[in-house]
């Protein structure tokens, strides 16, 4: 039997095929392009999305937390969901982009997975209206060089402009 120190902190699992998402690949790319423009304007190399609505909006994956944290990290070139091992391969199948699964074997594996995906950067955009004070402190304790900038209002402004696909779904 493996000891706790031999068990992985996080891993990737691409099992099965990608499931149909609520929107087309072009729609997710449109959203990510707009977010990346915001990132560029603010000098951010990454955004850490933690709310259910923004993770779903940018990745297509709607999580149920089961008391565990979830995220979507958008970088200049990628979109990666961070999910708990309890969901195994489902987040990868049900999201646009990549997925990294963290395990419960050791405390703070979620933050280790987040730090693994974040690029070498000193500034990351966050949802200040969703990330708790405890989570911000944990993020800072595991990466002392990382500064967080609240972009929650900017993200909400981006989401206010609806695409044709969004309007079509709303009218159903």
Language-model features: where?
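A composition/biophysics-driven feature that prefers long, compositionally simple stretches
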Residues: 1-169
């Amino acid at each position: 039997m493996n000891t706790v120190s031999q068990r992985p902190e996080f891993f990737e699992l691409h099992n099965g095929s990608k499931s149909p998402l609520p929107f087309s690949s072009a729609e997710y790319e449109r959203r990510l392009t707009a977010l990346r423009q915001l990132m560029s304007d603010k000098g951010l190399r990454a955004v850490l999305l933690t709310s259910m609505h923004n993770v779903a909006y940018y990745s297509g994956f709607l999580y149920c937390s089961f008391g565990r944290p979830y995220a979507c990290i958008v970088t200049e070139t990628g979109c990666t969901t961070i999910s708990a091992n309890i969901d195994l391969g489902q987040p990868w199948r049900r999201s646009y982009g990549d997925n990294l699964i963290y395990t419960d074997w050791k405390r703070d594996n979620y933050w280790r997975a987040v730090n693994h995906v974040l690029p070498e950067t000193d500034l990351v955009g966050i949802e200040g209206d969703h990330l708790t004070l405890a989570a911000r402190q944990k993020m800072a304790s595991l990466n002392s060089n990382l500064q967080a900038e609240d972009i929650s209002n900017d993200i909400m402004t981006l989401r206010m402009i609806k695409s044709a696909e969004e309007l079509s779904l709303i009218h159903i």
